[in-house]
Amino acid sequence: MDIQLKRGVLDVCVLKAIKNEDSYGYKIIKDVKPVLELSESTLYTILKRLEEANMLVVRVVIHEGRIRKYYHITENGLKRIEEFKSEWKELMDIYQFIVEE
């Protein structure tokens, strides 16, 4: 799979995982696991990239004596999900054309 396409898919999967409620790293990995194997290091790279792109913001909370970062989707992140859905539909139309006999 093309690296840019894969990166886009991973980014949107992470955004989707935090769309309805703020979440933290381990829970995000657990939430996307049914559709995607995601390592911790890959997730944190994605989260950093999304934060730099203003698609999410980070809130630090002390939980059971430990620091936990919660990630919250921004309007830019919500917009990216919608853009991706539109782009994916176009890709699916192209795919149908290619595999058609």
Model regions: which residues?
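Short, hydrophobic-biased segments on the C-terminal half of alpha helices
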Residues: 47-49
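N-terminal helix-turn-helix DNA-binding core of bacterial DNA-binding proteins
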Residues: 2-42
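Amphipathic alpha-helical dimerization/coiled-coil segments
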Residues: 82-101
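Beta-hairpin "wing" of winged helix-turn-helix
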Residues: 53-67, 72
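Residues that scaffold the ATP/ADP-binding catalytic core of kinase and kinase-like folds
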Residues: 17, 80-81
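Ser/Thr-centric signal marking residues that sit
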Residues: 42-45, 74
